[in-house]
Amino acid sequence: IPGLAYGNSPSEYPRDFIENKILVITTTNGTKLLHLALKQGAKDIITGSFPNLSKVVEYLKEQNAPVILGCSGWKNRFNIEDVLFAGAVIEEIKDAFEIHCDSSFMANQLYNQHKNDLPTYIKTVTHWHRLAAYGLEEDMLYCISKDTAPSLPIFKDGALINKA
């Protein structure tokens, strides 16, 4: 189908290609997590990663409501880069929220242990090696770069919309 020959690499979606267009994107585990959150009655669902970390944190603090951070992983398995991002969020919101969860504590510790050199640490994880085999090292480095995409996708009325 014309126009549907794209993957999930950030480099495949330059601004001039996506600006002012409607995109339909599905992922293996991210889509599953979205459906699970909807099934469980989530009030608000936002999509976060290091490139929009500050927008995620700002939104969560504005809402001042209980939060569940869902790490979608890869092939239904634990994924370090997702947990690192959760740890980064927790680091930024922990003074505004009570956190009583071992997995959150662990994510925050992992992030704090590696936050000063994420590029070096990320090169040790399994996903780096999978993507490196396809020449996608720059994708991983982009995905751990903070605040390079100052937008906030929010799921509302059956669609992800951008809260810039």
Where are these regions (language model features)?
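Short, structured patches in soluble enzyme cores that scaffold and shape functional sites
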Residues: 25-29, 47-50, 69-73
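Phosphate/ribose-phosphate-bearing ligand recognition and processing surfaces
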Residues: 72-82
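Long, charged alpha-helical interface segments
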Residues: 7-22, 26-28, 32, 36-44, ...
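Structured catalytic-domain cores with a bias toward divalent-metal coordination
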Residues: 2-10, 21, 50, 62-69
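A short acidic, often aromatic-flanked loop/helix-cap motif at beta-alpha or helix-coil junctions
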Residues: 1, 53-55, 76, 159-160
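Residue-level signal for well-ordered alpha-helical segments
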Residues: 66, 70, 117-120
